[in-house]
């Protein structure tokens, strides 16, 4: 069932998503080689709480084994939803950070991929094509289109035009 949101609800959703964006912007300022993803997660956790948000991933799951982190951080070939850890980031790493925040009872959630230092030409190309694919999908996120239309646009650009794979 689809629940239509009113203007006030949409504004609250926007504010939550904006705090996710601000958190990712804060992370962008500090990322560097030698830093651990566990440290980055702690920065994320504190920033969210300092801005009256609640990290929505933290504590998620069964009571016996809740997710312990404020974010999911994937480095290089870790596909998605990696756990922050004590491994140090290196020059050329690509780091995807996924953050969810509850603000005023509304969730905001998105991810961003960062390069640590100067990545290889191959990695730069992957990042470029991935970003282009995102925008191809966004172009198809219009009234009367389906999720499949968005997915097809992304897959077409990523796989058929550039030879990369899409995780399913």
Predicted segments, located by residue:
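Active-site neighborhoods and metal-handling regions in enzymes and metal-associated proteins
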Residues: 1-168
């Amino acid at each position: 069932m689809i629940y239509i949101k009113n203007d006030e609800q949409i504004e609250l959703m926007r504010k939550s998503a904006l705090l996710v964006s601000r958190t990712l912007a804060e992370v962008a300022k500090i990322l560097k080689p030698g830093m651990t993803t566990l440290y980055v997660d702690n920065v994320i956790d504190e920033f969210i709480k300092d801005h009256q948000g609640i990290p929505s991933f933290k504590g998620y799951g069964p009571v016996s084994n809740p997710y312990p982190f404020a974010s999911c951080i994937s480095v290089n070939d870790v596909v998605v939803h990696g756990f922050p850890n004590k491994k140090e980031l290196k020059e050329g790493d690509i780091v995807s950070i996924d953050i969810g925040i509850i603000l005023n009872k509304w969730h905001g959630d998105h991810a961003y991929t960062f390069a640590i230092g100067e990545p290889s030409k191959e990695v730069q190309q992957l990042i470029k094509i991935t970003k282009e694919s995102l925008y191809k999908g966004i172009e198809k996120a219009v009234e009367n289109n389906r999720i499949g239309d968005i997915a097809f646009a992304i897959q077409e650009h990523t796989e058929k035009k550039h030879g990369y794979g899409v995780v399913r």
